[in-house]
Each structure stands twice: as C-alpha cells, then as structure tokens.
C-alpha cells in the first residue's frame, strides 16, 4: 500500500460537535440527569459531556447478557479519572483516594498510563459525593477526559535532580493554563463553590478552547533524557528537556504523536511525534497554547476517527503546520538540540536522591492497587501513607514511587514494605516488569478482548519460554490492549497484542526499546496457543542469534522477521 494521503474534511460536523456547541460550556442537562432516580445510566448526549468532567458511563459487561435475559437495564456504573499532573499525590491525597475507592467504587485504585488515578464501579448516586471528596483533597477530575488537553505527564521522580523538579513545575503550569475555564464543573458537582488550592477556573467563555473545545483529545508529555518513560513521541505535544551544564536550557518540541487506530481502516494509524524546534522554559506555555489552537482551528470535526492532531499534520504537512504555529507565536522556534533516549521503563527499588532523600519504585501489576488473599497491596500502601512525610508519584508505566523518604523515615517505610511483602518486581522476569495493560473488560465499552485481567496469566506461560532461553533478566517491553485505541501505548512495545475479538489478538513486533520506533503487524487474529508457538520460535532465535546489547525489537527487524516502520503513514504497508 502506498503512503496514506488524507482528504480534507468536507462533511458536516459530527454529532459530538453539536452536543458541545449546544452544551452551554459543558453544562448540558447533566445536573438534572444525575438527579434522575429512574435509571442508573444517563442519556448519550450527557455522557459525551460527562467525559469533560472526568467520567465515563460504563457497565459491567460480565453480566450484560444475563441482565438482558432478565429484561434489566445494563449494570451501569461510572469510571472517574483524577487529574494529577506529573503523577504527584500527597500521602493525605492517597488516603482520600483509598477511602473513596473502598466507600464508593469497587474497592480498588487503577494507576493509569498517563499518571492519573481511576476509580471504577461508582454508582450514579455516588458520583457527586465522589467528586466532592476528590476536590476536598485539592484534586480535580475536570478535563481528565474529553476533547481537551488531558493530564500533563512528566518524569515521575522530580527530586532525582533540580532539573526534574523544574520540569515538574512546568508540567503543572501547562496543566493549569490549558484547563477549561467554564464554571459548569463547579456548579454541577461542587454546588458552585471554589475549593481553595485547586487551579483557578473562572469566567464564562473559553478564551483558548472556544464553545466547541478541540476536535478530539489532546495529550502533552515531558521527557527528561535518557529516560523516555512518558513515551514522549506518543504525545500530541512531546517536550524533550534539554539539560546543559546541569541546568534546564529548554525543550525540544515534538508534535503529532498518537497511538489509536481502527481495525480494518487504513486511513487510521499510529504515529510518532516529530521534532520541529526548540524553545526556552519561559516560552513553553505559550508554545503549547499556540500549537493547541492550530489543532482547534484545523482539526477534522467531521470524522472523529481522523480528528487527532497527527492526522491534521499529515493532511496539511509538517512544515505548513510549523509555519502556522510560528505565525501565531510571532517568532520562530530555535533549532532542535541533541538528545539521547535509552529506555522507556521504570527504575525499581530504592534510589537515593540528590538531596539526601530516598525513593522506592514499587512494581504494581497492571496498575491495579487492591488487596488479594495473599497480597495486601492496598492495605500496605494505606499504612505507609499514614506515616510517610514525602509524596507518592504515579509512573507512566502504571507503577508507584514512594518518593522523598527521609533518612529518618526510611527504616519505618522499609519495615512496612517488608511486612506487607510489597515488591520492587526484581523477583519477576524483566519482561513482566516491562509489561503494560489497559483496563479492557469488564468495564471498558470499547474493549474487544481482555487485557489487564489476562496479560498476567499469559505472562506466566511466556515466562516459561523466557526461562528456557536464559532471558529472565533481558529487558523486553510487552503491552496488551483490549482494542486498537492504544491506551497502553501498545505499538511502542517490542511485543504488543491488540484485542480483535474475545480471546483473539493482533500481534505486533519491532518497536524500539526506547520508544522511538513503532511496531509492525506480525500475526493477525491469533489466540493463546498460536501466540505461545510464535514466541517460542522468536525468543529462541533471539537468544541464539542476537548481537551484543541488541534489543529484541531491533533484532526482529535485523533478522527480517518484520519490516521497520519508518512513519505512521506507511504503518499498514
């Protein structure tokens, strides 16, 4: 297939655009709908708006068929996402989230791939109380979902250096500046009260977004080389911190990343952001705003599957988009500066910071904080939060850093880690430590197959092959998503599985270990037996034929197993 050439949007605006336009800045009839006692669900128009408030209406798909037989409405429930720039939460905030999860949700916390909290299983009657409790802890769900700028990501441990701390401050500034200004959120959930300490939001109009906000979601992430833990090239705006003489000189600016696609539609594809220049720290907020307004004005509002910024850039041309950004800025971006990425994973266990504090990175399988019969992760973290004087940092790989532990507190924290058996993951294979999975079934309405619930079981079987080939400590990234939307940034994993139907997956190989190259479709619509058969051959070859220091993703390309993807527009070649 030739390189994809996208048509200009020439149809009428999609129905979602009507909903936004008529919503009176995200109000709609949400206030009335949420008070309606007749149904546990809400109408579709309001559900579209609900996303901007940080929540999705879902249902328990495990019982959907049975409820249909009984002529009952679906087991409706809400997912609520908490916006935490850079993934930072205080111990007090952690304890509030823990309490909310047990009181109003399904008793678990999900740490997301965008460094946010998710609550699942919240019933309609408890949504407002949940929102109020979250805001009472000086957090918000506003713009955690929807056609707006989402949670701003950055390296999760700002106290590794002064640069990390500074980058985190810029992530917070970007997050606050690009937050919607509507009062609707406060009117509906907080009875129009402003909570002290939360970002200032006031005014009736949206000076940046306008009445219809953006054509689709928008994502920003900041990476600090050599770590690409935020997968900076998957972002609509990827900012690469440039450090010179130990100081933050500024950011290389990359635009147009995105992982989502639609099965069978070759006009949709994942894409990596491309570097267009450099800006200084004091310019970065203005640069991000102007980039976002280009997408606001030129993005496809007719066909939502082609509405992300990556498609706008590929349709108009990178240079055209760059020129328009610079026209709006009134000045030209600087020349991009050298940088180098080594990996996109986390560093586990204890790490000493530059200021005498300690940080413990905890492995959290699937990002799910819960208590099982034999592993009391949720209880252990609750007890740590009660005595911890530093903070918690959610990583982009669904793990958790117990950060800024003082020397005086370290022994106490270590004792609690030991008491509850909390793990840094080092007893697992490196493959498992480098795994990611989205939520998928039973709550996600888009999921075509399992992900979070299934990947650990599949890994049990893959690890047998890993051990047979002496690869237990070999760092290989593996990710699974229940659909092709890419919440777990699937095609940036060296081995990736994308749900096609229940028990069936498309298998991708060949992404770069450092997140700088997309994977390629290797096998389509395969089940567990074929997955294991393929991996048995591939991993055996890798163990025998790899070069010194060669990563698995590089090996499968060099060996001719898959073709290298050089750009998203030829992803389907």
UniProtKB/Swiss-Prot annotation:
Pfam families: NIR_SIR (PF01077), NIR_SIR_ferr (PF03460). Binds 1 siroheme per subunit. GO terms for cellular component: sulfite reductase complex (NADPH). The keyword Iron applies. Its EC number is 1.8.1.2. PROSITE patterns: NIR_SIR (PS00365). InterPro entries: CysI, NiRdtase/SiRdtase_haem-b_fer, Nit/Sulf_reduc_fer-like_dom_sf, NO2/SO3_Rdtase_4Fe4S_dom, NO2/SO3_Rdtase_4Fe4S_prot, NO2/SO3_Rdtase_4Fe4S_sf, NO2/SO3_Rdtase_FeS/sirohaem_BS. GO terms for biological process: cysteine biosynthetic process; hydrogen sulfide biosynthetic process; sulfate assimilation. Belongs to the nitrite and sulfite reductase 4Fe-4S domain family. Keywords: 4Fe-4S, Amino-acid biosynthesis, Cysteine biosynthesis, Heme, Iron, Iron-sulfur, Metal-binding, NADP, Oxidoreductase. It comes from the Bacteria. NCBIfam families: CysI, PRK13504.1. Component of the sulfite reductase complex that catalyzes the 6-electron reduction of sulfite to sulfide. This is one of several activities required for the biosynthesis of L-cysteine from sulfate. [4Fe-4S] cluster binds at residues 438, 444, 483, 487. Alpha(8)-beta(8). The alpha component is a flavoprotein, the beta component is a hemoprotein. Siroheme binds at residue 487. This is Sulfite reductase [NADPH] hemoprotein beta-component.
């Amino acid at each position: 297939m030739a390189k994809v050439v996208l048509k200009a949007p020439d149809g009428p605006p999609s129905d979602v655009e009507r909903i936004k336009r008529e919503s009176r800045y995200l109000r709609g009839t949400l206030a009335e709908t949420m008070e309606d006692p007749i149904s546990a669900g809400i109408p579709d128009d309001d559900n579209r708006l609900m996303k901007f408030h940080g929540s999705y209406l879902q249902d328990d798909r495990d019982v959907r068929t049975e409820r249909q037989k009984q002529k009952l409405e679906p087991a409706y429930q809400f997912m609520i996402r908490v916006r935490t720039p850079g993934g930072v939460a205080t111990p007090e905030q952690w304890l509030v989230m823990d309490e909310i999860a047990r009181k109003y949700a399904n008793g678990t916390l999900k740490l997301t791939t965008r460094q946010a909290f998710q609550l699942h299983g919240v019933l309609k009657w408890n949504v407002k109380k949940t929102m109020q409790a979250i805001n009472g802890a000086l957090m918000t769900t506003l713009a955690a979902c929807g056609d707006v700028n989402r949670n701003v990501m950055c390296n999760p441990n700002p106290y590794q250096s002064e640069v990390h701390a500074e980058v985190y401050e810029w992530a917070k500034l970007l997050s606050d500046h690009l937050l919607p200004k509507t009062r609707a959120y406060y009117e509906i959930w907080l009875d129009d009260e402003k909570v002290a300490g939360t970002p200032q939001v006031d005014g009736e109009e949206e000076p940046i977004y306008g009445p219809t906000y953006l054509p689709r979601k928008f994502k920003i992430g900041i990476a600090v080389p050599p770590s690409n833990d935020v997968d900076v090239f998957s972002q609509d705006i990827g900012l690469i911190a440039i450090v010179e003489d130990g100081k933050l000189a500024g950011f290389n600016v990359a635009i147009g990343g995105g992982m989502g696609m639609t099965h069978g539609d070759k006009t949709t594809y994942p894409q990596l952001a491309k570097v267009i220049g450099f800006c200084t720290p004091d310019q970065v907020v203005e640069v991000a705003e102007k980039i976002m307004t280009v997408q606001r004005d030129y993005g496809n509002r007719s066909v939502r599957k082609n509405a992300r910024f990556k498609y706008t850039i590929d349709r108009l041309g990178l240079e055209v988009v760059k020129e328009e950004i610079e026209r709006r800025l009134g000045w030209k971006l600087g020349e991009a500066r050298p940088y180098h990425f080594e990996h996109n994973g986390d560093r586990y266990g204890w790490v000493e910071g530059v200021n005498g504090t300690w940080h413990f990175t905890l492995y959290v399988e699937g990002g799910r904080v819960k208590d099982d019969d034999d592993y009391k992760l949720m209880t252990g973290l609750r007890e740590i939060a009660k005595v911890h004087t530093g903070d918690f940092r959610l990583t982009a790989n669904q793990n958790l850093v117990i950060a800024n532990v003082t020397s005086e507190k370290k022994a106490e924290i270590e004792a609690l880690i030991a008491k509850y058996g909390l793990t840094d993951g080092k007893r697992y294979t490196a493959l498992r430590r480098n795994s990611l999975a989205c939520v998928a079934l039973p709550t996600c309405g888009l999921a075509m197959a399992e992900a979070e619930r299934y990947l650990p079981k599949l890994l049990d079987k893959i690890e047998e092959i890993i051990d047979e080939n002496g690869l237990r400590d070999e760092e290989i990234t593996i990710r699974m998503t229940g659909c092709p939307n890419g919440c777990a940034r699937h095609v940036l994993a060296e081995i990736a599985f994308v749900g096609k139907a229940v028990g069936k997956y498309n298998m991708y190989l060949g992404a770069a270990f450092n997140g700088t190259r997309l994977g390629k479709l290797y096998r389509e619509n395969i089940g567990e037996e074929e997955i294991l058969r393929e991996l048995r051959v591939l991993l055996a070859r890798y163990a025998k034929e790899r070069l010194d220091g060669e990563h698995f993703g590089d090996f499968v390309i060099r060996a001719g197993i898959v073709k290298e993807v050089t750009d998203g527009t030829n992803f389907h070649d």
